[in-house]
Amino acid sequence: MSNLREECGVFGVFSGETNDVASTTYYGLFALQHRGQESCGIVVNDDGVFTDYKDTGLVNDVFTPNIIDRLGEGNIAIGHVRYGTTGSSERSNAQPIVVNHIKGKMALAHNGNLINSGELRRELELEGSIFHTTSDTEVISYIITKERLSAPSIEQAVNHAVDRIKGAYSLVIMSPSKLIAVRDENGFRPLCYGITKDGRYIVASESCALDAVGAEFIRDIKPGEIVVFDKNGVRSIEDHCGKAPGALCVFEYIYFARPDSVIDGCSVHSARLRAGAFLALEHPVQADVVIGVPDSGLDAALGYSKQSGIPYEIGFIKNKYIGRTFIAPGQKSREDKVKIKLNPIAEVVKGKRVVMIDDSIVRGTTSARIVKLLREAGAKEIHMRVCLLYTSDA
């Protein structure tokens, strides 16, 4: 893998009765906004009639009250927030994707990236498929619809398609009567589900989105598992479970996920605290203050402080209107955002030996700029500690 990528957030809701599933999906996507800020979309299913809207931009900007009203009520909905991994940031690559086929229709949203997308795309094009986007999500949707020609049900088509798609993926799929959740055999990307007090099933990339809509967490979806939600309840297809070792991306705990999420039974907040404590044990230093780089470095900084006994302070003020720097598309955009995203609190660092905790180094864009900011604010010494180092040629 030549560069590190964050791969979006997915959300789905299944209800036994028609209700405002669009608003529920909106709030779920809002809770997942940290996973991608390029584009977002929602598809609502009202008794087999699909209504969708998607565009570039943040959830709060794209889904105005008028747009939510236009989506209307339904009993199933899926949604997506995107950070591009394959395909450009154009509106055409926004998700979910809606596909009409000879046996009905389907909507699909995808978190991840395939390693055999190019091979599958060429195969499908030779068979006559016409692609309207450059994302591999459309490849997945065409593979499923192709399998649906001979499969007795949409879930069996998905089960057969899983044999063909290789890579990291968590999917939410909507048919006229079902919501389907799929996690790849390695469990590389997170996916979980829960239930609201009024009996609606919720699927999401992270448990924080369940909290946002008042759903009780039931469990994580297993690596390789397909979970089907319909009028008969919930059932699981585990034909692909246990075929590969678990391999959740470590960046989920270090950077991608919100600290209030629980992934595969482990609190993200606790994982970051432990990472900071480990840093203090492995790389101690004489210093006056510990600070963290907002937001994902804060928990680790607190862990470092507790383990080392060095006081923890808030060292930076973050401009909350600036998106996450690493997942901003384009190097120039990332550099510009760092300049206005963070400002050190001079009285905390001036004349002091500072331990600065960051979650990771990928491109080094943020780190170099932040060290310069601390020097300009008068820090006597700067001791940088990093939870995870990732070598990238990006």
Task: Label each PLM-derived region with a short phrase.
Residues 1-223, 228-287, 293, 381:
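Conserved short alpha-helical segments that host acidic/polar catalytic motifs at enzyme active sites
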Residues 129, 150-151, 284-288, 306-313, ...:
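Secondary-structure transition/capping motifs at alpha-helix termini
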Residues 139, 297-298, 317-322:
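Short acidic loop-to-helix transition motifs that present clustered carboxylates
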Residues 290, 297-301, 312, 353-374:
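Extended, hydrophobic alpha-helical segments in both membrane/secreted and soluble proteins
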Residues 304, 360, 382:
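Hydrophobic, well-ordered secondary-structure elements that form the walls
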Residues 309-354, 365-368:
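Short, glycine/charge-rich flexible loops or terminal/linker lids adjacent to PRPP-binding catalytic cores
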Residues 386:
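Short beta-strand-centered segment that lines the nucleotide-binding/catalytic pocket of NTP-utilizing
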Residues 390-394:
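Conserved small/polar residues in nucleotide/adenosyl-binding loops
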